[in-house]
Amino acid sequence: MTKLSLLPLLTLASAVLAKQDAFQAKCASFGRKIKLPNVHVNFVEYVPGGTNLTLPDNDVTCGASSQVVSADMCRVAMAVDTSKSSQITLEAWFPREYTGRFLSTGNGGLSGCIQYYDLAYTAGLGFATVGANNGHNGTSGKPFYQHPEVIEDFAYRSIHTGVVVGKQLTKMFYKEGFDKSYYLGCSTGGRQGFKSIQKYPNDFDGVVAGAPAFNFVNLISWSIHFYSITGSNTSDTYLSPESWKVVHDEIVRQCDEIDGAKDGIIEDTDLCQPVIETIICKPGASDKTNCITGAQAKTVRNVLSPFYGVNGNLLYPRMQPGSELFASSVVYNGQPFRYSTDWYRYVVYNNPDWDATKWTVEDAAVALAQNPYNIQTWDADISSFQKAGGKVLTYHGMQDQLISSDNSKLYYARVAEEMGLGPEELDDFYRFFPVSGMAHCTGGDGAYGIGNGLRTYNGAEPENNVLMAMVQWVEKGIAPEFIRGAKFSNGVGSSVEYTRKHCRYPRRNVYKGPGNYSDENAWECV
């Protein structure tokens, strides 16, 4: 009797093992089958779920020497020529538990870093996933120097090349090919998503583009212009991180309860117009720990003002209030912003010795006139993507310290004006969700856990996961009315203090009660 009762289990175990062995065998032989133009396979390997994958070839500046992989998958590493003098490093990760979906990841900053955490995240969700190094290695802009082909890879070609090759490989690896194609990226990755929408409208069925770095050239100039406002850390116009906390606390005091709840979160930064004069130190004050000087107050006012060009034209909107604590260490730190310095040195002026401390708004005009390969990514007519049936879901943290969320609002307005469509019509294919309490792509003081990556994960249900919400929109026609964010007690994996439904633009969240502010149903999108 015992042997008979074990037979079904043994049969099932054998079937599972055979399936596993077949997948490993397919992976082991796959490299020999890849004979695509300009594609040079470095290696193909089977990676079991639970492996802490070492990444010895990842540039040290990318900050990732290993990556935990949650799902069994076949890893394909290759180089792909993009011209006679340039190539991208590309990886494709094919999960054993495949859902029939293809996905491309993006990049960040000026970096030439494959975002292995996004590969692991999306492969773990069953996507056949690709990621590339943007045509160079490391986070510096130095590879752009006198190398326009590398700039072209960075502007658009790396992502598109990876998509073309990745789709071919997916069809080769899985006999069923793929049903739908998706994109997931934030920051530079958000810009890359919109570049695909604008230039290659048939590449993706669904694009999730967070905190997009479009209006790119002006973003570069906006980021460096803060130094001309704050000066160095010895200037009387400079604010220390401690002084920025004083400013931040006052801004929150003035603007927190505009939404109806005192929770430390500004729900709609458009309604926040802080009066900074309230914290100028009184004449003769002996204790200046909770106030700032008049010169510093002027710095704050200028930092929170739009950025205009030499002819008075708007180049970039203001930094949204509420991001002061996060921004104090990166763009208000008394040094020219590093990515901007690199862009001007190695792209705009081709001069590694260019002095970033001498930057003026005239330099912004030079950079914008150059706009190599239309890296601005600012085209407002996305009708080709609309006609192709594509969907785009974009989000932007309203505590973003690197890319103002006001810029995403500006692009939304430009698309509406260019295409002659109001919010109801745009909702059919383009939905934008400002996320209160979210910093740059992740982190922040509020409910930032929206599932755009491993660092914001709070479940794979569409209502809790911005990527899976896009899948549901594309495959079932159910468009997201909101995206739910989780407020973690101590980062991803810790307890969830509360959740909040972030409204789709141009709606905004208002506290109505009767429950506590931590009750998501006590809020209403108006």
Swiss-Prot record:
The keyword Glycoprotein applies. One of its GO terms (cellular component) is extracellular region. The active site is at S187, D400, H440. Keywords: Calcium, Carbohydrate metabolism, Disulfide bond, Glycoprotein, Hydrolase, Metal-binding, Polysaccharide degradation, Secreted, Serine esterase, Signal, Xylan degradation. GO terms for biological process: xylan catabolic process. GO terms for molecular function: carboxylic ester hydrolase activity; feruloyl esterase activity; metal ion binding. It comes from the Eukaryota. It catalyses: feruloyl-polysaccharide + H2O = ferulate + polysaccharide. Transmembrane segments: none annotated. InterPro entries: AB_hydrolase_fold, Tannase/feruloyl_esterase. Disulfide bonds join C27-C74, C62-C113, C186-C441, C255-C272, C281-C291, C503-C525. Its EC number is 3.1.1.73. SUPFAM superfamilies: alpha/beta-Hydrolases (SSF53474). Glycans are attached at N52, N137, N233, N516. Residues 1-18 form the signal peptide. Pfam families: Tannase (PF07519). Ca(2+) binds at D256, D259, A261, D263, I265. Involved in degradation of plant cell walls. Hydrolyzes the feruloyl-arabinose ester bond in arabinoxylans as well as the feruloyl-galactose and feruloyl-arabinose ester bonds in pectin. This is Probable feruloyl esterase B-2. The lineage of its organism: Eukaryota, Fungi, Dikarya, Ascomycota, Pezizomycotina. The gene is faeB-2.
